Amino acid sequence: MPVITLPNGSKREFSNPITVLDVAADIGPGLAKATLAGIVDGKEVDAGFTIEQDAALSIVTEKSPEGLEVIRHSTAHLLAQAVKSLFPEAQVTIGPVIDDGFYYDFAYSRAFTPEDLAAIEKKMTELSEQDIPVSRRVLPRDEAVAFFRGIGEDYKAEIIESIPANEDLSLYKQGDFEDLCRGPHVPSTGKLKYFKLMKVAGAYWRGDAKNEMLQRIYGTAWANKKDLKAYLHRLEEAEKRDHRKLGKKFDLFHLQEEAPGMVFWHPKGWSVYTAIEQYMRKVQRENGYKEIKTPQVVDRSLWERSGHWDKFRDGMFTVESESRDYAVKPMNCPCHIQVFNQGLKSYRDLPLRFAEFGSCHRNEASGTLQGIMRVRAFTQDDGHIFCAEDAIQSEVSIFTDLLYEVYRDFGFEDVIIRLSTRPEQRVGSEEVWDKSEKALADALNAKGLAFEYLPGEGAFYGPKIEFSLKDCIGRVWQCGTIQVDFSMPARLDAQFVAEDGSRQVPVMLHRAILGSFERFIGILIENYEGAFPPWLAPEQVVVMNITDNQAEYAEKVRNSLQNEGFRVVSDLRNEKIGFKIREHTIQKVPYLLVVGDQEMENNSVAVRTREGKDLGTYSVDDFATLLADSVAKRGRA
């Protein structure tokens, strides 16, 4: 007689073993209809799972946090069923859930076309409308291998052969299609209504370029029509805002094959870059950071001592000279410790905060490169704080204040915080991990900042906090981080003299706010759709004459504003003023100044904004004040 405890604490007693779906039906027919799966004693199970003894049960519906993953995983199987129905000779491989959707890899004799994709999606809809029941069975590993070999699914059989022989495996069947999966899955295909196939791409079998090229079909799936429509709208917005397109449109940067993953900054783009660098230099100096600069190319012996040569060797660019091996630095931390080690430090010197606009190179796979968002050469707003263990909380608190101020200045208010705790493989004592994790959590709690734990996701050398920004169309970008490191300072012989005269190893806090300049600028381009706030705009003002008669005066205005430190250009072309205004509006210049005979006589300018608002006539000095006020707001409303 199982007693089922529900999330609200209420209990229901049943005379016989009962399925999750039947419990839902006992609660009410509406819940039964909405049931996708269940969570029994913390484990996700199918709606048809039988509960034989007392248990805690949560019913998973589309409104549950787990519901969307069940829908997406089940839709991946629906995709595979549709492909096998239309292309029986295709072989299935893997089909995991990813952010916002899923994919499934297929081996097939020819490339899938856009027409194929449309036909597959249509077939998926037909299979959904048939409301085919989904059932589960369990087989020993060797029987599962034989089953998939017998139906010609060699890739699937190969996957199963890599699983230990003593394991049983679950298979899910819907109609005449059966696939390997841990589950859970929806009770029937009729639960899968709101999906869209997005694209086809190539993917190597098992991710190895030496293996066969497969075809990866990407799709998205949602719990309801509204969410699907909203997601597709976000994709349209993201396409319009693609930083690669806007970078070309606004002449900010380019990339080319001769230097893959490395940015060629144009004058306008470099103007944005240097504005950010100057700003970060100022705020870090004001917050007690000492700026340093360390070498680009360092002997392998340092990377061996730091552990990077063993753990990160494939991601490093290396060079040999005079029988010595060097690496172009992929990160700055070992070099910062070398600066710390110059001269014995006392506890009175701590905390010591180093900052570097550190140029790094990582040998990312060419297929992972994406515009300036994922590159091989990048600059970090990198910093390392050397402190005693008992200072971790206060340093994290100070850093968090700085991070929020910076994000607000760039126009970001919505910050998502995650705290990653100890992984299975780690260094340091449990006591030190306990104290460090508590210090990070206490620093966030003391400020009333909401955060979620990511158990086991910390680095091997210590726990970390990650800060992600939500942009204007709802996308989330991980940018900032602060990480506790017990390991590297000891490996590289960092010490300080404690108050009792003993030699102790400092804790090192790795920290960044923007992450990489390249990626952060890409985020800004897309967030603002190229319309940078005035303080960042590569050209803050354009001065335009109506006729040649005002050309000299327009140049005088430009020089006057430029001497005030503003970024100003003039447009003296013999074109109609309406044409000039339209062109510079398209280029998203924040302020457009028009000068005619009247403005020239009155030493004034007619002011328009890129949004098309006519601000009227200002004296040059008054406009300079208006512009200075606008710049001073930075990205804040």
From Swiss-Prot:
Could you give the subunit structure recorded for this chain? Answer: Homodimer.
Catalytic reactions of this protein: tRNA(Thr) + L-threonine + ATP = L-threonyl-tRNA(Thr) + AMP + diphosphate + H(+)
Please give the Gene Ontology molecular function terms for this protein.
ATP binding; metal ion binding; threonine-tRNA ligase activity; tRNA binding
- Where, subcellularly, is it found? Cytoplasm
Annotated Gene3D superfamilies: 3.10.20.30, 3.30.54.20, Anticodon-binding domain (3.40.50.800), Bira Bifunctional Protein, Domain 2 (3.30.930.10), Threonyl-trna Synthetase, Chain A, domain 2 (3.30.980.10)
Keyword Protein biosynthesis listed? The answer is: yes
Q: Which CDD domains does this UniProt record tie to the protein?
A: TGS_ThrRS, ThrRS_anticodon, ThrRS_core
Query: Where do transmembrane segments lie in this chain?
Result: none
User: Which Pfam family is one of those matched by this entry?
Assistant: HGTP_anticodon
Function per UniProt: Catalyzes the attachment of threonine to tRNA(Thr) in a two-step reaction: L-threonine is first activated by ATP to form Thr-AMP and then transferred to the acceptor end of tRNA(Thr). Also edits incorrectly charged L-seryl-tRNA(Thr).
UniProt cofactor note: Binds 1 zinc ion per subunit.
Q: Which residues does the record give as Zn(2+) binding sites?
A: 333, 384, 510
What Enzyme Commission number(s) does the record list for this chain?
6.1.1.3
What name does this protein carry? Threonine--tRNA ligase
Q: Where is this region: Catalytic?
A: 242-533
- Indicate the segments forming the TGS domain, all copies: 1-61
